[in-house]
């Protein structure tokens, strides 16, 4: 039987703990043959904290762990009896349904792509109001006109002397209002 990807519902905030517990339990039970990868899909994000750029991880699916496994009575019980696991997502309680290969590939591709360049933690949309927190236009409010995620820059229309003036800023220089 081929290994398929299943989504396991874990306590929110304990996804990494559940992942480590599952890996350990699989080894202790000698079931490495029935299990493949066990992972918490995350991406690296950059945020500003106290004027410093900090890298952190953001989970794609908070509260969920992806498990590649052959579904049988033994593997089902091993996962279900792991502390802080609430159960499987999809199918029925005693016969969980795997996610499609296309869904699994999309998630794995997204995880692989996220390692290339960290994304900003805050996403900006054209038309939304932001406050400039750094630079010559600090404390001005403006409307987002364009967002360039490759360069981590944002074009904001700031009202100066009663006229709308486009200003190009870095993500770290603005915050959502």
Swiss-Prot record:
Q: Does the keyword Transcription regulation apply?
A: yes
- Kindly state which keywords UniProt assigns to this record, in alphabetical order: Transcription, Transcription antitermination, Transcription regulation, Transcription termination
Per its UniProt record, what SMART domains does this chain match?
KOW, NGN
What PROSITE patterns does UniProt report for this protein, alphabetically? Answer: NUSG
Q: Which residues cross the membrane?
A: none
KOW domain location is 126-156
InterPro entries in the cross-refs: KOW, NGN, NGN-like_dom, NGN_dom_sf, NusG-like, Rib_uL2_dom2, Transcrpt_antiterm_NusG, Transcrpt_antiterm_NusG_bac_CS
Q: List the protein's name.
A: Transcription termination/antitermination protein NusG
Entry keyword Transcription: yes
Per the UniProt entry, what are the Gene Ontology biological process annotations, in alphabetical order?
DNA-templated transcription termination; regulation of DNA-templated transcription elongation; transcription antitermination; transcription elongation-coupled chromatin remodeling
> What domain of life?
Bacteria
Role description: Participates in transcription elongation, termination and antitermination.
Q: What family is reported?
A: Belongs to the NusG family.
